[in-house]
Amino acid sequence: MPLFDLKSPYPPAGDQPQAIEALTKSLKNNNHYQTLVGVTGSGKTYTMANIIAQTNKPALIMSHNKTLCAQLYSEFKAFFPHNRVEYFISHFDYYQPESYIPRRDLFIEKDSSINDDLERLRLSATTSLLGYDDVIVIASVSANYGLGNPEEYLKVMEKIKVGEKRAYKSFLLKLVEMGYSRNEVVFDRGSFRATGECVDIFPAYNDAEFIRIEFFGDEIERIAVFDALEKNEIKRLDSVMLYAASQFAVGSERLNLAIKSIEDELALRLKFFKEQDKMLEYNRLKQRTEHDLEMISATGVCKGIENYARHFTGKAPNETPFCLFDYLGIFEREFLVIVDESHVSLPQFGGMYAGDMSRKSVLVEYGFRLPSALDNRPLKFDEFIHKNCQFLFVSATPNKLELELSKKNVAEQIIRPTGLLDPKFEVRDSDKQVQDLFDEIKLVVARGERVLITTLTKKMAEELCKYYAEWGLKARYMHSEIDAIERNHIIRSLRLKEFDILIGINLLREGLDLPEVSLVAIMDADKEGFLRSETSLIQTMGRAARNANGKVLLYAKKITQSMQKAFEITSYRRAKQEEFNKIHNITPKTVTRALEEELKLRDDEIRIAKALKKDKMPKSEREKIIKELDKKMRECTKNLDFEEAMRLRDEIAQLRTL
């Protein structure tokens, strides 16, 4: 029986049918690795969706940054509205890991800020994987970091049935063991409240509904689901599955084993420091670890509990830690891993382990942590790439690694469903690049189209932006210090024609889906290096491939080897696309992609609240607006529009102070 229900108004077109068929066949033949080489705008995401639907396996889609993850999440939610599409990225808004600098004798405490919504989405992903098969998880590099033991997580979950016998007090204790906290005042995610014989539980993985369990003596009489905002009953249930409030939750038996294991390791390490006559490290480790043990014994958690993860999961020293892959592969289930933009993602995954190990080794050496802290780590690259699953690498410019691993299992997707061609390109002398480009920009802007310019330095981007602004052009620049939310805002503003020219350094390559852009300019294209490599040039040139007037200008004094290879590949693709269009009588058309409604207009609720004199508003009216804003805020959070959600949250807070 099919697991996935793929919805799309269009059938596969261009090169999509043959790519879907070839890669699905390869996967069904149990090949471990395969690669999709797909040009920009060829519909790689739709091809991925079709492959998932046809292979009928849970899937993990990994990307190298949060912006692309959010984009993929939105697209797959639309493709699979009736399936469980989940989102799993880092839950930290801010993260400063603990570290020690010996030469300065400086210990830096861990400092972090957890995003409650991202934490909920992570929990939703793991609970879906443990309860269902029709799951697609969109994940960042976070998928490679350690999690709790999924089998222990299953032991902690509870199935609650109407009519079953349960002692009321022991049920409350079980909720605490599952990581829920009792709070009669602030009732939100991961908490419960008990009044009389009624227990309300707010699941940690759901912010829209809470569960009410009604007892009659020691028997469960009624189970109901309530809307968290309206507080009205949605439905009654005969039974409900309740999952733990944390991925690291363990039962009391495992907790006691972990405490004993930590104590044993501490004794061995203290003996080592004593024999080495390192009494400073001895006392430091003894004090810190014994304090943590007291907290774990009393509450089940402590600050930095992740450093003891190996003891809680039951793993041996140096053994591969549990991670999201183990939740996908629970019950020996087969699953598919798709690595999007693999030419960037795989090198990023490969560099994670070394940096983490370097920092923690110093902490262990100087007595800040037990050696087991080294086992709370991301996967090594070999562990990742040899996971017991199937891999599909997706990129317009795959590296040698992907192609070697995939051998003959490589599919090309060069023909676009829209008939669009790879852009024309032209090399011009870099001596007068600024003025020459100025003349080209005026022509593009006059047509109502946009321009992307990539430079080698932040300073040049700033100066170029300032220069063109002085000449009356609307330009902005983007650099690495701009966060993801502001980056999205800039891209949206470009599409809305609030400005016409976007200038950047390394931010214009992957994932920019901008059909309004018809001109891409690459300054100093002959300066060999990472930013002007064959891969980077092809990716950057591809940004002009979503517009029928797409054109690339490369400013240089000479043609480098990287430029020559990029030109050969682009010319090969363009020739193949032109031939296909001629045979099938296709006229290239610019991609049309609707701007999201919320980008054009502020929410009506916000405008109303701001227009009214809130301090004179009747309380009942104010409460009504708060309720509407709160509902909208939750919808924005669910759609990963955190910027709008934060704005709504602030509006609600302001109204509540009146």
UniProtKB/Swiss-Prot annotation:
Q: What is the effect of changing N376T?
A: In strain: 84-183
Outcome when changing A475V: In strain: 84-183
Q: Which Pfam families match?
A: Helicase_C (PF00271), ResIII (PF04851), UVR (PF02151), UvrB (PF12344), UvrB_inter (PF17757)
Tell whether Calcium is among the UniProt keywords. Answer: no
Report the locations given in the UniProt record.
Answer: Cytoplasm
**Where is it chiefly localized?**
cytoplasm
Please list the residue ranges annotated as the Helicase C-terminal domain. 433-607
**One MF term in GO for this entry?**
excinuclease ABC activity
Record keyword Secreted present: no
Would you kindly state one Gene Ontology biological process term found in this protein's UniProt entry?
Answer: nucleotide-excision repair, DNA damage recognition
Provide the effect of I259V: In strain: 84-183
Lineage: superkingdom: Bacteria
Q: Which family does it belong to?
A: Belongs to the UvrB family.
Q: What does this protein do?
A: The UvrABC repair system catalyzes the recognition and processing of DNA lesions. A damage recognition complex composed of 2 UvrA and 2 UvrB subunits scans DNA for abnormalities. Upon binding of the UvrA(2)B(2) complex to a putative damaged site, the DNA wraps around one UvrB monomer. DNA wrap is dependent on ATP binding by UvrB and probably causes local melting of the DNA helix, facilitating insertion of UvrB beta-hairpin between the DNA strands. Then UvrB probes one DNA strand for the presence of a lesion.
Q: What's the record's remark on domains?
A: The beta-hairpin motif is involved in DNA binding.
Q: What is this protein called?
A: UvrABC system protein B
Which classification does the entry list for the species? Bacteria, Pseudomonadati, Campylobacterota, Epsilonproteobacteria, Campylobacterales
Which gene underlies this protein? uvrB
